[in-house]
């Protein structure tokens, strides 16, 4: 009898750690705050001593550092980004280390409307270290990056180099034609 029940026992689903629902709530709350442009609410999901490495390789330390970065990029007099959207996907459940530390990673689909009028869509990768402090999960470290060899900024630079090259070629042909005509007229 025990032999017959072994396959049933092997198929029993693993019990998921309740921490994962708490972490999903953090993710959903943070995404909602980002969608609404609520910087102060975004900061409430970050540890006071958070370290964030942004896509442009800038590093912000602490909630104040993150606030300054976001204000400068999104709201300041010299802001760079007019509008921002992001959809975050987690690759798998957070790897938990004990009951108060976790590491999560995944991808995000980003859309930026820049102040220059350019819109940029790209996929990024991210990783985060999360800690549970006073019963609440917080992001202690966040790192975001994009593909160095295949990204929209590189594509725009490549396109611009083709345009500039074409304009220079046409200008060179026109200048050569004009100089050639001048020499003929001088004879």
List the predicted regions and their residue ranges:
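Surface-exposed, charged secondary-structure patches
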Residues: 55, 64-118
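Short, well-ordered alpha-helical segments enriched in acidic and aromatic residues
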Residues: 36-54, 61
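Short, low-complexity N-terminal intrinsically disordered segments enriched in polar/charged residues
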Residues: 10-40, 44, 157-165, 169-187
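A mature extracytoplasmic/lumenal domain signature
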Residues: 46, 56, 106-108, 126-128, ...
């Amino acid at each position: 009898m025990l032999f017959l029940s072994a396959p049933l026992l092997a198929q029993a689903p693993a019990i998921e750690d309740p921490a994962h629902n708490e972490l999903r709530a953090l993710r959903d709350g943070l995404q909602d705050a980002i969608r609404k442009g609520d910087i102060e609410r975004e900061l409430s999901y970050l540890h006071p001593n958070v370290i964030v490495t942004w896509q442009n390789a800038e590093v912000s330390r602490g909630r104040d550092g993150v606030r300054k970065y976001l204000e400068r990029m999104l709201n300041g007099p010299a802001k760079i980004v007019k509008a921002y959207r992001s959809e975050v996907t987690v690759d798998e459940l957070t790897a938990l280390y004990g009951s108060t530390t976790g590491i999560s990673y995944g991808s995000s689909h980003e859309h930026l409307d820049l102040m220059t009028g350019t819109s940029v869509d790209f996929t990024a990768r991210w990783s985060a270290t999360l800690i549970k402090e006073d019963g609440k999960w917080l992001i202690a470290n966040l790192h975001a990056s994009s593909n160095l060899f295949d990204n929209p900024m590189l594509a725009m630079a490549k396109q611009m180099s083709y345009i500039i090259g074409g304009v220079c070629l046409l200008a060179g042909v026109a200048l050569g034609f004009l100089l050639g005509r001048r020499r003929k007229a001088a004879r």
